[in-house]
Regions:
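Structural motif
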Residues: 1-7, 44-50, 124-132, 145
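Short helix-capping/linker segments at secondary-structure and domain boundaries
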Residues: 20-24, 65-66, 143-150
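Small-residue-rich helix-loop
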Residues: 24-126
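Charged substrate- and nucleic-acid-binding regions of tRNA-handling and nucleotidyl-transfer enzymes
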Residues: 113-172
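Short, hydrophobic/amphipathic alpha-helical patches that form generic packing surfaces
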Residues: 13-17, 56-62, 135-142
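Amphipathic alpha-helical interaction elements
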Residues: 3, 16-20, 42, 105-108, ...
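A conserved active-site cap/scaffold subdomain adjacent to cofactor or substrate pockets
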Residues: 1-38
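Non-catalytic, well-ordered alpha-helical scaffold segments
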Residues: 8-12, 25, 51, 55, ...
Length: 172
């Protein structure tokens, strides 16, 4: 017989299952403890947004580090743009961001149902696909082309913060 060995992929798989099924209040407590110990304490004005966003932040997360990384865009006041990603913001992407912001100003309630028609309209008018709209918006809102779904990002940030981030000078 061979000796037993530590299988990290199996442990991470079990941890992912545990994170998906755990009570979100308990998960939030664990996340705040983790951040306080290993990262930086979550600011009190951001805690409510993080707590409400755990439903989607924990998707595909295998560790508390993954949840922290997925929610980093909520925790920061100023976005640090990934330089490789900011290069993707060309003139067409700037137009998409500007057009989205114009239409976004007109909506009162943030939900997938109110955001989807705006995105679909931008896809048509800019003769592009979802990536052509979603990617520039994700970069503008989070500083990276990777992250949660675009509707989740917008809803979690709230109208005021989204407008502030979409009008960032770097994107002009």
């Amino acid at each position: 017989k061979s000796p037993s060995k530590l299988d990290m992929s199996r442990i991470l798989s079990m941890n992912e299952h545990y994170i998906k099924n755990i009570d979100e209040n308990y998960l939030f407590e664990q996340l705040t403890g983790y951040c306080k110990l290993y990262k930086s304490e979550i600011k009190s004005d951001k805690k409510d947004k993080i707590k409400k966003s755990l439903t989607f932040l924990k998707n595909k997360a295998k560790t508390l580090e993954d949840i922290f990384n997925n929610g980093q865009y909520i925790m920061v006041d100023e976005i640090n743009f990934n330089q490789d990603d900011i290069k993707l913001i060309d003139d067409k992407a700037k137009k998409v961001i500007s057009d989205f912001n114009t239409q976004f100003d007109r909506i009162d309630k943030l939900s997938k149902e109110t955001l989807e028609p705006i995105v679909n309209e931008l896809i048509k008018t800019n003769d592009t696909n979802f990536k052509g709209v979603g990617q520039p918006l994700r970069i503008a809102l989070t500083g990276s082309k990777f992250g949660p779904g675009i509707y989740d990002i917008i809803i979690s940030l709230g109208k005021e913060e989204v407008t502030k981030r979409l009008t960032n000078k770097i994107l002009s």
